[in-house]
Amino acid sequence: RIYLDTCCLNRPFDNQADARIHLETEAIRTILDLCEQGQWELLDSEVLALEICQTPNLLRQKYITLLLAPAIMTIQLTDIIINQAKLFESLGIKAFDALHMACAIANADVLLTVDDKFLKKAQSIDTHPLRVAHPLRWLEETLYDFYS
């Protein structure tokens, strides 16, 4: 089960002339395609919906929402998730990122992000079982393992 944070979902709208951004976008599109084909399971959350609604461009909002169409479930905010997020926030994770982590912990195998600061900070916290990874690296490792 895969949880993409909002940075991943917004990546297709970033400057594709930048090689890194282009590669990350292709990885994210591949992951979404494989979820749509049923090879992997995509997760959505109330936190993602809230963050997407804050996007000023309505067309972008609609497109991002469509990217989440293959999601098999929407993770609801609960007191447990909010308390877990507060713990992550106390460890230096930003509020929305902490909520994404807390949503993903009980439901996902991996949380993917292109936010380098969040990725580094989340990987440094060893009090949770969740794998937080970069989509390009994760896709490469996962496909390599699958085809080996």
Report each predicted region and the residues it spans.
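Acidic, PIN/NYN-like endoribonuclease modules and their adjacent C-terminal/linker elements
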Residues: R1, N15-T25, L34, S90, ...
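PIN/NYN-family metal-dependent endoribonuclease catalytic core
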Residues: Y3-P56, A69, T74, L136-L143
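Short beta-strand scaffold positions
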Residues: L4, Q76, A95-A98, T113
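Alpha-helix capping/helix-boundary segments
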Residues: C8, L48, I81, L99-H100, ...
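Short, basic, glycine/proline-bearing loop/turn elements
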Residues: D14-A17, D79-E89
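Phosphate- and divalent-cation-binding pockets in alpha/beta enzyme and binding domains
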Residues: E51, Q84, K120-K121
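Short, aromatic/basic amphipathic alpha-helical patches
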Residues: L58-L66, K120-D126
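Helix-adjacent hinge/juxtasegments
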Residues: Q61-A85
